[in-house]
Amino acid sequence: MSSSSYFVNPAFFPTYPHAGEQFYATPSGSYELSSCAFSKNPKTSSYSSSSSPSLVATSKPPCTQQLGAATFYGGGTLSNFSTTAGYGDHSTTSAGYGSMSQPISPTSAWDSRMAATYNSASWGSTAAELGDGSYRGRVSALTAGTGCLVSAAAEPNNNHCSQVMSPCKSTSGYPWMPVSGPNVGLEVGRKRCRQTYTRYQTLELEKEFHFNRYLTRRRRIELSHLLGLTERQIKIWFQNRRMKYKKESKNKEEGGSGEGEGENESESTGTENAQPQSAVHGVTILEKPSSLVLHVDDTVGLNAVRHT
């Protein structure tokens, strides 16, 4: 394919046939075209009316457009490729729309069709309009389904497209997104372990807490050098120890107040249940809210009762 656009080169600008120029039958039973869209020859190729799937070309010059050799991802090289070819049997057809110098394997048929579509005349305008300078760069696209990176690179000399498929990698779009997969533990940073203190460190910290519940910055630095701990670890230990001390003191206060209240309640209930009794000279007086009852012994006379 030349570097000039199809507006300059008349070969890329198709000439449409007139309304009267249609297919017409020949005495031999074949059908011929009235004119070719990409050639100046009036009659170029014919089609056989037989049931054979292969295409038969007449002795007339074929209607083909010479394009640059294209190298495909699946393998194989295509030369003398027509702008309207691509639907026949590549392995058996040797004439007709175009000829192939090397057959393409069936496994790479889809790749070759895609590459042929890029090199066809329908897409030739895009490559020609962009020019060699702007079409040399790589075009990268991330497919939505699998995340495979497809890059199409164009060489400046022969302007053929080669598709390079990179291996699919299921990577997250942003670094802060969670990583899913079998190797999650290896990629994610190791979780911070809980700090364990030795008996010596705990004893020194307890002694310091007994004298000072709050440490100054200077004393905290001294303890960090003495015990081999960081200032942050010492600060957190003192915070936890103060919370523990507050909880213990609160429980003690609740326990002491509960015992005192229990003793007072027992005393009050005992006094309420006990009935006040008073004996004066052998007379027992039972106090009741409704009336006063006197029990007089037989040995005591009425004088004693009057005296009371």
From Swiss-Prot:
One of its GO terms (molecular function) is DNA-binding transcription factor activity, RNA polymerase II-specific. It is found in: Nucleus. Keywords: Developmental protein, DNA-binding, Homeobox, Nucleus. Residues 247-280 are annotated as: Disordered. It comes from the Eukaryota. The keyword DNA-binding applies. One of its GO terms (biological process) is regulation of transcription by RNA polymerase II. GO terms for cellular component: nucleus. A motif (Antp-type hexapeptide) lies at residues 173-178. Its main location: nucleus. InterPro entries: Antp_homeobox (IPR050296), HD (IPR001356), HD_metazoa (IPR020479), Homeobox_CS (IPR017970), Homeodomain-like_sf (IPR009057), HTH_motif (IPR000047). Gene3D superfamilies: Homeodomain-like. Belongs to the Antp homeobox family. This is Homeobox protein HB1. It comes from Strongylocentrotus purpuratus (Purple sea urchin). The lineage of its organism: Eukaryota, Metazoa, Echinodermata, Eleutherozoa, Echinozoa.
